């Protein structure tokens, strides 16, 4: 008689548990769909640094006074008030009205600045997804990717990309996805910091980028940042679903009941 009651209780608990799991699986994934609403890259401040260089009011892959492969007050790769990697009131990789990259604040203070508090949730996410990059304000470096095959609209640009793609990044810098309200903000920030960091690192070695290089690099990095967002969103959703599953009352009750049976 006792065994039949125990079996009935176990059956009821399992039904309640799987009902709760079914509800968890119906929860929508964070972030929303791609290409939904508004411009692709809202005009918001980027925590990683300056926005993309001024390009005459065009969006990604849009003309700046001309289509792809057409002059913009000059031919491809020619300077517009100065070549890429050279100062424009503080150019790529050079100070903009202050200290260099990774520097800031006042120096010579009597007291040391207080250390920022560590968010353990972000640390756990970093351990699962990638290493936190020192000196870049909590950005993580993603795993290496194959550079995407992109067509730029002209034979010259396609050939130029195939011949120079090795000079462009194959990894991106990013912050945890839970720090962004949507995928557009994530990709915008990811492209900003990745292009800037790669340009700074390369120009310090004596190699400059042309305007053609920068535009192609932005397109390449954009695709990799989208891929990185999809990976991180999926991992974040799975971690959240696991936490919800094991913290649900039916599961806790079932575990407690099984422990009671084993101990008793």
Curated annotation (Swiss-Prot):
GO cellular component: a single term: side of membrane
Alphabetical list of Pfam families matching this protein: Prion, Prion_bPrPp, Prion_octapep
UniProt propeptide residues: 242-264
Binding-site residues, Cu(2+) 1: 72-74
Residues covered by region (6 X 8 AA tandem repeats of P-H-G-G-G-W-G-Q): 54-103
A biological-process GO annotation: protein homooligomerization
Protein name: Major prion protein 1
